[in-house]
Design a protein with these regions (language model features):
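Beta-strand-rich recognition/accessory modules
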Residues: 1-19, 29, 39, 106-111, ...
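Extended, loop-rich substrate-binding clefts of extracytoplasmic carbohydrate-active enzymes
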Residues: 4, 8, 77-131
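Hydrophobic residues positioned within well-ordered beta-strands of beta-sheet architectures
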Residues: 14, 24, 101-103, 124-126, ...
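Acidic-aromatic substrate-binding/catalytic surfaces of carbohydrate-active enzymes
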Residues: 22-78, 252
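Asparagine-centered strand-capping/turn motif at beta-strand->loop junctions
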Residues: 26, 139-145
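Beta-strand elements of well-folded, non-transmembrane domains
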Residues: 107-109, 128-132, 143-145, 157-161, ...
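Active-site/ligand-binding surface loops and adjacent short beta/alpha elements
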Residues: 148-150, 154-228
Length: 278
């Protein structure tokens, strides 16, 4: 297992390699997983060619860390401050063929405007582990203060699917979802296909399969309460300045989430886990 400091664009980053040759790169900015290559050298995550990589704006691609609120479901910064704060490398290592890095963030790491807007004592720990053809993320939120605070959380993973029109998601049949127009429906078909914009919040934690022309990703979660599935489609993609017009055809976002603000008691902690297997 090897760990080296490197750069991704202008961002300081940690690159770690498993004994089988699998490799991942995590920026300190946002604890943002920017690259995951399995032992065969194939990149599994999508990062936009147009995204800023200099540490002042959120990154389009990889795995953005959403905390303490999802989207605008809270009073603060959209999708929270975790993805635009600089984390610290706390630990790294591995055994039995695995490799991991662990990053941390607390209130002392925040920019003054973020600390003022969200005046709570907290500690975040995010550990990425590679083992074989699998990547696991373990995300822990601790309330280190004397009063409860509400929070939402998600890991907004962008998968490189190559060809959107050859991509499906299975495992969501009979599950309830809310779409971008706030319509609530039940998915009555076995596989979700992508031929238009999708922005769905599924009230489900079932195991999913993301099927592409060349790969099947097996996705599971613990501790979270929903799956979010998103692709902007052609029209919305054209309005995103940090995404090339045709890049929407290369990715699908599937994220484990707890989108609503839920209280965490003083001294308590919450842990969510997400596993991606190939």
């Amino acid at each position: 297992m090897a760990v080296t400091m490197t750069q991704f664009g202008a961002l300081p980053a940690v690159q770690f390699t498993a004994p089988d040759g699998a490799q991942a790169t995590v920026a300190l900015f946002g604890a943002h997983l920017l690259s995951w290559k399995t032992a065969d050298g194939v990149e599994r995550l999508f990062v936009s060619s147009q995204t800023p990589l200099y540490g002042s704006k959120a990154i389009r691609g990889g795995v953005p860390v959403i905390f303490p609120q999802f989207n605008v479901r809270g009073p603060g910064l959209r999708h929270g401050f975790a993805r635009v704060s600089t984390w610290r490398l706390a630990d790294s290592g591995g055994d039995n063929g695995s490799a991991f890095v662990e990053l941390v963030l607390d209130q002392s790491d925040l920019a003054p405007e973020h600390a003022q807007a969200w005046p709570h004592q907290f500690a975040l720990t995010l550990r990425f582990t590679m083992h074989g053809n699998a990547l696991e993320a373990g995300f822990t939120v601790r309330n280190t203060g004397a009063a409860p605070f509400p929070f939402g959380v998600a890991l907004h993973t962008y998968y490189d699917v190559g060809q959107l029109n050859a991509t499906t998601i299975s495992g969501l049949q009979h599950q309830q979802y809310t779409d971008h127009e706030l319509n609530t429906r039940i998915q009555d078909y076995p596989a979700l296909h992508f031929n238009e914009k999708h922005d769905r919040l599924y009230q489900s934690t079932s195991t999913l399969m993301l099927n592409t022309a060349s790969t099947t990703f097996n996705l599971s979660q613990q501790g979270f309460t929903e799956w979010v599935v998103w692709n902007p489609g052609q029209v919305d993609a054209a309005a995103l300045v940090d995404l090339a017009d045709d890049e929407y055809q290369r990715f699908v976002c599937i994220e484990p989430a707890r989108v609503d603000q839920q209280p965490l008691a003083a001294g308590a902690q919450w842990t969510g886990r997400h596993r991606i297997g190939i």
